[in-house]
Amino acid sequence: MAEAAALFSLSAAAVVEDVLRQHGCRLSDRDLASRRAEEAAARRNEAAGWLRRTVGAVAARDLPEEPSEEEFRLGLRNGQILCGALNRVHPGAVPKACAHVVFVNLIRSRCAVCHCSVMVVVNTAADSVLQPDGAALSAFQYFENVRNFLVAAQEIGLPCFEASDLEQGGKSARVVNCVLALKSYGDWKQCGGTGPWKYGGNLKPSASGKSFVRKNSEPFRRCQSMNEGEVPYEEAGFSGDYHLDSGDMSTSRPLKMLVSAVLSDKRPDEVPQVKAALKNGTDGTKSFSKSKMDTIEVYSKHRQTKKEAYGEVTLKQYSMLQLQSKHVEELKADIRATKAGMEFMQMKYSEDINILGRHLFSLAHAASGYHIVLEENRKLYNQVQDLKGSIRVYCRVRPFLPGQVSSCAVGSIDEGNITIITPSKSGKEGRKTFSFNKVFGPSATQDEVFLDTQPLIRSVLDGYNVCIFAYGQTGSGKTYTMSGPKNMTEQTQGVNYRALSDLFKLAEQRKGAFIYDIAVQMIEIYNEQVRDLLVNDGLNKRLEIRNNSQNGLNVPDASLVCVASTMDVMELMNVGQKNRAVGATALNDRSSRSHSCLTVHVQGRDLTSGTILRGCMHLVDLAGSERVDKSEVTGERLKEAQHINKSLSALGDVIASLAQKSAHVPYRNSKLTQLLQDSLGGQAKTLMFVHISPESDALGESISTLKFAERVSTVELGAARLNKESGEVKELKEQIARLKSSLAMKDSGSEQNINRDPEAFNMKMPSPGFSNRRQGSCELVSSQTNFRQPMEDVGNIEVRANPTLRQKKPSFDLQDLLASNDSPSWPDSISRANFQMGEERVTIGGEWIDKVVVNNNNSVGDWEGDSAALPDFFYQRYHSGTRDKQYLRNNSRKKDGNEFEQQRPRFYSTNTDDSDDIDIATSDSSESDALWQFNVQSINSSISENGSKIKKPQTKLRESSDTRTPLHSQIPSASRKTSNGNRSGRQPLSGSDSRRLSSNGRHAGTK
């Protein structure tokens, strides 16, 4: 029994040594261990997945898809899944029947030497029992299935594992390696099995001595066939002397197995030594055991040292973990406090936002009210401007040109103020501020500029005259504002294009209530010559300006073209821009060398009431003032610059006279001022764009331009007139004109009726085009060829001959005075007011009224005899085909201003306040006609005493054959008019005539 104990002790020592050898080479690197654990888990999952797919989910119900090491071991412990997988890969490799059942008990015991856990195999024989289907398998069936699998796998050449690897504490890595090798073998067979098969996995050979039972050892095979408790020690190398009783060994079967396992690793020549050591207890065995014990002791000490070091590290890590846990708790507390603070701040922010929202709402409400008040103030301001007739002045600053580097002379720009930086003599920077209605900076767009002028432009459709002109030095952007650049786009279109487009849009919106006819003219003033820009030969044709034209045609001979859309306007304006005089100077490569004027005539008719509205809009692009030393012009360009500067100087004189409210305004000093006379004289709403350059080099010109614009803004022209005529008045005037025309035709052949009814000569045959102005595509074009008709107080409207309405005013017609039985005698002197009324009547009456006055005076010549017949040439004058031509030539005569100033003192007792009316009156009627109206009054006062004086001019008339109109020669003291081509000059009164008027003492006076 003692020998058996010694054998067990030796075997236990060998086992402990093997265990130490196994565990001594572990790596201390935890990261490497975790990485290997992850790799092992991945391989295990791959093997489990393949097994489930191979044998089916039902057969592999005990094996999860991603099992742990313990689940993997328990799932494969019965061997059914392994055998099933092997039979699927290699059919018939594992038989299903078992010959007998052997219970194998693996008992875990503790080693007495090192107290480590060891596995002891205990075999117990039992009768052969067949388990029914579905019943739990016995331990023998588990072992038998595993053994059959291992045998078949070894025959195939697969890497095998030990049966103990499937028990608790076994190595599942070798099982996984075997399963993956089987998977690779199955894939090789499915591919055809061509070529040698070799598993490419990580094959680790099993170390000897690590298990109690070896698959190739003879004791393992004998253990399977044992059915009795007796062990064949002879085969194990033991002699017959060392024989244990079966009764004794039956109680220590695990010891047998352990001894067999130990001796199985020994070579045959070592077995006798082991037996001798066990039997005799020799010193060699003791020394061997002692060395083993020393090794174990050293290992134990080393392990204890490592354990202590690990304990210190663990303690340190634990303290650090505690500290970190404390910090985490503190952070959690801070987070909770921060969260509470954020919630409080969010609540406060919500309250503040609500308060700000209420304040913002109140501010928005106040702002909306402010904008409403501002809009009302703007409307009221515009109404005040309209009532005062002030010229609106808008200032625009041109941006710097590309590539231009210069200091800016513009300091600041506000809503209506602009500040210019001016250097002073002391070297300090000075500033001058100018105020206008609106100031546009360099960044202002064309659309912004037009939006402020849009209400003014739209008033044209309401029957008002509008004038917009651009002023400034050359190169300051006048043409850009009015027309646009050379390569024009929709965004860069100027005021001209936008104004006409807006008129068409508004006319389209009002088409249900009004019908509008729109026509345009485009002229230029080049070197004091008026030229038509809408015709190809307009450069060679000279046009005349007639300011008293009642239909807005100040240049009646210019082309008047009807337009119906914006495209028509653009085509016409392109033609006009091509024909305009443009040249290159040192200041501007496209310098305008002329003043251009685009005139838009609008006539509208109210479909409900029949009211006629007429409006006229002048869009004037003035040529820029320039200094010859800067523009470096010579030759023809120099001549152009001189004419431009002269006309702009005349415009400045007119503005100065208007600002000072002078009695005389020199409109006729230039063609430009003569063209703008109606607009500057209070007949229209006027707007001036003043342009300046931002460069410091142009500081002098900019300040001069701004000063001129300030003077313009102070001019008050009076309220603009509304050109409106009701339908009833129009019908009555047409009816009166027709009645007078028919009466004149009936009485023209009766001398007696003419003498009794001189009013018959106050009638003029209406022009066919005038009586039917709606014929043709455009009413305004047809009216261009007609004679201008008289104009009443309603403004520039179409008026038929209506002397009945004129009777509402004090009449100074000689026949009207004589027709009244109880009329008072003619006063010796005429008051200033009555004279102005008479002069207004002459002006408003138009061309044919002047002729009627002369006609009435002819009857005065024969006043002594009521039945006296008039000469034949009198009737020929009013019924000849050349009557209108003579009258037009009469209207186009040039009048010398100095002669008029010399002759006016003879007929005015006092100076008149409105010299413009005199200019208008003398522009279309001959001076002798104006003189005749007052000479007739003088004759009327002394007709009974000086009858011979009336007949004397008639004798002169018969003797003179070069006079234009015979009737004018009957005027007692009128100046003689001689014909000189298309121009006629006035001759001063002869000395006898002057003395004759002075002797009467009626109208002589000094200026």
UniProtKB/Swiss-Prot annotation:
Q: What are this entry's molecular-function GO terms?
A: ATP binding; microtubule binding; microtubule motor activity
Gene Ontology, cellular component aspect: microtubule; microtubule cytoskeleton
Q: Which residues form the Kinesin motor domain?
A: 390-715
Alphabetical list of InterPro entries matching this protein = CH_dom, CH_dom_sf, Kinesin-like_fam, Kinesin_motor_dom, Kinesin_motor_dom_sf, P-loop_NTPase
Which residue stretches does the UniProt record annotate as biased composition, category Basic and acidic residues?
885-904
* Taxonomic superkingdom: Eukaryota
Presence of the UniProt keyword rRNA processing in the record: no
PROSITE patterns (alphabetical): CH (PS50021), KINESIN_MOTOR_2 (PS50067)
From start to end residue, where is composition biased (Polar residues)?
Answer: 963-1001
A GO biological-process term: microtubule-based process
Which Gene3D superfamilies does the record match to this protein?
A: Calponin-like domain, Kinesin motor domain
- Record carries keyword Transport: no
Region: Disordered; residue ranges are 885-924, 944-1007
Family statement drawn from the similarity comment of this UniProt entry: Belongs to the TRAFAC class myosin-kinesin ATPase superfamily. Kinesin family. KIN-14 subfamily.
Protein name in UniProt: Kinesin-like protein KIN-14F
Q: What organism is this sequence from?
A: Oryza sativa subsp. japonica (Rice)
